[in-house]
A protein has these predicted regions:
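N-terminal charged segments
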Residues: 2-101
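Conserved beta-hairpin
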Residues: 54-59, 111-116, 120-124, 194-210
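Conserved acetyl-CoA binding element of GNAT-fold acetyltransferases
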Residues: 71-81, 219-230
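Acyl-donor-binding surface of acyltransferase catalytic domains
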Residues: 80-156, 261, 281-285
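Conserved acetyl-CoA-binding loop-helix of GNAT-fold acetyltransferases
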Residues: 84-93, 225-230, 234-247, 251, ...
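Conserved active-site alpha-helix within GNAT-family acetyltransferase domains
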Residues: 114-125, 235, 239, 251, ...
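A short, well-structured alpha-helix characteristic of acyl/acetyltransferase catalytic modules
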Residues: 157-170
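A conserved beta-strand-loop-helix scaffold within acyl/acetyltransferase catalytic domains
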Residues: 176-229
């Protein structure tokens, strides 16, 4: 991953631009680590759902299978050094056991720059997410950026979870009819009690989704499943959703919003005030990593 350079020991001062650069680099490194902390928290919550399967890896980290046939929904999460062959063999055995047919269930393995041994095992780099963050506590963040046409409804029951799953599925470019395993996963996330699922609505029609994940002790909240179906993308729904996210996060006493953006989403998030922290390479046998 592209982690900012290690800070120099120089103290920052107006006469010391290297010190100021070191300070910015350290802030960027801490922000990048916060994104990974939040992602680990979110995936750990999914590990606890009865509909998911998981296993610890030798040397640290874990595998997570959500029941999906999409690589982007199944994860290996392991921080630190590039993986060794023992960890890769363990991950492949796990996802082979999860597969409904021949071969292994698809999955993504993020983080190690260059992939270490992963490409030798048929897991080349397939794309990159951009870790991003923005604050939500200053005066400029209190302005109403919402759209009066858009309302927001928290997902509080299974019926709401079913609609949320369908809207999110279409928001990521698929046609009607989300797969059954996705409905099961969303029902589990709704029942978790720690994750916050919200539906955006226009004229009583579901128009967008997002999920917020935040550890109780963390000053930050992470955004997941931020999705707007194509028919609502020119009606200001995404902008209204981001304004609602900032309001929810502030009300929860948090100071920062974190996310991992796909390439297509980066321009919107930059316009919404997010800053880039570093790239997260994704390694997979499949190409559906976003």
């Amino acid at each position: 991953m592209r982690v900012p350079v290690k800070p120099m020991p120089n103290a920052p001062s107006p006469e010391n631009p290297m010190g100021r650069e070191a300070e910015r680099a350290e802030a960027g490194r801490q922000g990048f680590d916060a994104v990974l902390d939040n992602l680990e928290f979110f995936l750990t919550r999914l590990r606890g759902l009865s509909c998911c399967r998981s296993v610890d890896l030798p040397g640290g980290g874990f595998c997570l299978f959500t029941g999906s046939d999409s690589a982007s929904e199944n994860w290996v999460f392991r921080r630190g050094a590039a993986p060794d062959e023992e960890a890769v063999h363990a991950a492949l055995r796990f996802f082979e056991a999860c597969a409904a047919g021949e071969g292994a269930a698809p999955f993504i393995w993020p983080l190690p720059e260059g992939g270490g041994v992963l490409p030798r095992f048929g897991l080349p780099e397939r794309g990159r997410l951009l870790a991003m963050s923005r604050g939500c506590g200053g005066p400029a963040d209190t302005a109403d950026g919402g759209n009066p046409e858009v309302s927001f409804v928290p997902v509080l029951d299974e019926a709401g979870a079913e609609r949320w799953a369908e809207t999110m599925w279409q928001g990521f470019g698929a046609g009607p009819g989300a797969p059954g395993n996705l409905h099961v996963l969303v029902r589990g996330m709704r029942a978790d009690g720690t994750l916050t699922l919200v539906t955006a609505r226009i004229e009583d029609q579901d128009a967008g989704t997002f999920l917020l994940a935040s550890a109780p002790s963390s000053p930050a909240a992470g955004v997941y499943y931020f999705a707007v179906p194509p028919r609502y993308r020119r009606r200001g729904v995404a902008t209204a959703m981001m304004a609602e996210i900032l309001r929810i996060v502030r009300r929860g006493g948090k100071r920062q919003v974190l996310l991992q953006a796909t390439p297509s989403g980066v321009p919107f998030y930059l316009a919404a005030g997010f800053g880039a922290l570093g790239e997260i390479p994704l390694f997979s046998a499949g190409d559906d990593v976003f």
